[in-house]
C-alpha cells in the first residue's frame, strides 16, 4: 500500500510544478525584457559554426532553437550534452554555454576547451562559475533569474538563444 506521506508529497510537487508551468507566459515576457537590454558584441569575427552546450533543462532550449532555426541558418549548429567539444571548434566558432545554475560541470569543461581553442564564447546563466568564467575572460553573458528548476525556465533559454542569433546577424 502506498504511504500517505508519499501521496501528499507527490500532490504538493504537482501543485508546485503546475504553478511553475503556469508562469511560462510571464517568464516569456520577462525573458524578452532581459533580451532587450542584453548587449552581445559583434567584435568583427566571422562565425562559421555554432556549438550550444548545456545539460538537462538548460540544454532543452538549445535543441528547440536549433530545430526551429535549422532551415533559416546558413551555418551549422551542433548541440553538446556532455564533457566533449567537437574537434572542429576554433577561432571561427561560437560556443554558447547554457547552465541555469552556472555551475554545471560538463558545460564548464566544454567552455574551458573552447576557450583554449580560441572560440568566441557567450554564456547564459543565473550566476555561478559560468558568470565568473565569462566575466574573468571578458566574454559576453546574459543573466537570467535563478531559484527554480531549470526545466521550468525554458522561456529564458529559448529567448536568450534567439536573441544571441539575432544580435549577431546569424
Identify what each model region corresponds to:
Residues 44-170:
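Glycine-rich phosphate-binding loops that contact phosphosugars or nucleotide phosphates
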Residues 2-34, 38:
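N-terminal amphipathic/basic leader segments beginning at the initiator methionine
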Amino acid at each position: 500500500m502506498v504511504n500517505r506521506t508519499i501521496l501528499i508529497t507527490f500532490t504538493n510537487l504537482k501543485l508546485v510544478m503546475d504553478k511553475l508551468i503556469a508562469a511560462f507566459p510571464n517568464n516569456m515576457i520577462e525573458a524578452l525584457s532581459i533580451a532587450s537590454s542584453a548587449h552581445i558584441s559583434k567584435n568583427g569575427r566571422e562565425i562559421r559554426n555554432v556549438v550550444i552546450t548545456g545539460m538537462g533543462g538548460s540544454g532543452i532550449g538549445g535543441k528547440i532553437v536549433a530545430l526551429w532555426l535549422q532551415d533559416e541558418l546558413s551555418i551549422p549548429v551542433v548541440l553538446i550534452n556532455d564533457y566533449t567539444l567537437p574537434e572542429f571548434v576554433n577561432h571561427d566558432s561560437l560556443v554558447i554555454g547554457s547552465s541555469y545554475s552556472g555551475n554545471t560541470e560538463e558545460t564548464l569543461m566544454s567552455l574551458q576547451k573552447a576557450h583554449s581553442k580560441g572560440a568566441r564564447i557567450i554564456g547564459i546563466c543565473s550566476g555561478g562559475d559560468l558568470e565568473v568564467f565569462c566575466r574573468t575572460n571578458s566574454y559576453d553573458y546574459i543573466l537570467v533569474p535563478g531559484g527554480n528548476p531549470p526545466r521550468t525556465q525554458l522561456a529564458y533559454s529559448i529567448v536568450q538563444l534567439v536573441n544571441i542569433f539575432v544580435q549577431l546577424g546569424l
